[in-house]
UniProtKB/Swiss-Prot annotation:
Cofactor(s) demanded: Fe(2+)
Keyword DNA-binding attached: no
UniProt keyword Iron present: yes
Chain sites annotated for binding Fe cation 2: H132, H241, H270, H274
Function recorded in the entry: Stearoyl-CoA desaturase that utilizes O(2) and electrons from reduced cytochrome b5 to introduce the first double bond into saturated fatty acyl-CoA substrates. Catalyzes the insertion of a cis double bond at the delta-9 position into fatty acyl-CoA substrates including palmitoyl-CoA and stearoyl-CoA. Contributes to the biosynthesis of membrane phospholipids, cholesterol esters and triglycerides.
Catalyzed reactions: octadecanoyl-CoA + 2 Fe(II)-[cytochrome b5] + O2 + 2 H(+) = (9Z)-octadecenoyl-CoA + 2 Fe(III)-[cytochrome b5] + 2 H2O
Motif (Histidine box-2): 129-133
Signal peptide as annotated in the record: none
The organism of origin for this protein: Tachysurus fulvidraco (Yellow catfish)
Gene: SCD1
UniProt binding sites for substrate: N49, N120, R127, D128, K161, W234
GO biological processes: monounsaturated fatty acid biosynthetic process; response to fatty acid; unsaturated fatty acid biosynthetic process
Expressed in which tissues: Expression is highest in liver, followed by brain and intestine, and lowest in spleen. Also expressed in heart, gill and muscle.
Listed name of the protein: Acyl-CoA desaturase 1
Amino acid sequence: MTEVDDGCGGRLRGSVLLEDECDLKQECETPTHSLVQGRDPPVVVVWRNVVLMSVLHTAAVYGLVLLPSASAYTLLAFCFVSSALGITAGAHRLWSHRSYKASLPLRIFLAVANSMGFQNDIYEWARDHRVHHKYSETDADPHNASRGFFFAHIGWLLVKKHPKVIENGQKLELSDLKNDRVVMFQRRFYKHSVVVMCFLIPAMLPWFLWAESLWVGYFVPVLLRYALVLNATWLVNSAAHMWGNQPYDVNINPRENRFVTFSAIGEGFHNYHHTFPYDYATSEFGCRLNLTTCFINLMCVLGLAKDCRRVPTELVMARVKRTGDGSHRSG
């Protein structure tokens, strides 16, 4: 079995996975052609979501207008990064892919940060993401990019899920999530945690610490920040499935997109990620333009994370030569 140093004080297993990891890997990597496409059912618009998203983005534009008068820029950045890490390091890399192990304090922090991000609870987010990987670009993909940019970006949230998304989501093995006390606690109290973490605390802190008006505090660190994090995440589903190069596998839609990488703190190395979904860094290049990987590495140094799973360089290069588009550049 090939082992390399993981940079987290342990040994990585390369592409060789333990039995329970093989089950998760299979859930994420079944070929998409195994799903037979049929006639699309009628699209049912969820008008409540249309109204809420319209109001949110209108309020975010107003937040931009108020931005010059705001004093809590540091808090705005902190809330953006914190809520983004709750998605990227938490719901995505830890709970969807189990690409590293986190201690209880770190899992609690990531669950709290995930509630600040307000993109469905961890259980639902991870379930839908596993379906996305297993049936990417098919009717069972929640944000199927073959239906166009708008649908992949935000449209999928404005209509009822395709029946195949629900059907195939119910078939997944999710016992690891069900057995995680932090995940299930957050799911049970999700609405309460969102009210506190996404809306109350980011609005109240500027008022309490910097005498910022509650009006500015609500529209800038709350609504503007929330809309920015949402769109950064959505760009991974839309732009990173449409524009960019494919140095690792030209046979799949996901691309390497630098703008998305910067916006989503490291999630834009998407061709690599869909080729090697169990790699904790989601990139061949470690911390480069990858704040999430830097955060996980720091947690390893502090003893709060371990067993980061990484793909050996020789396997990456073999895949580049076999299925890449020729655009790969080392280093």
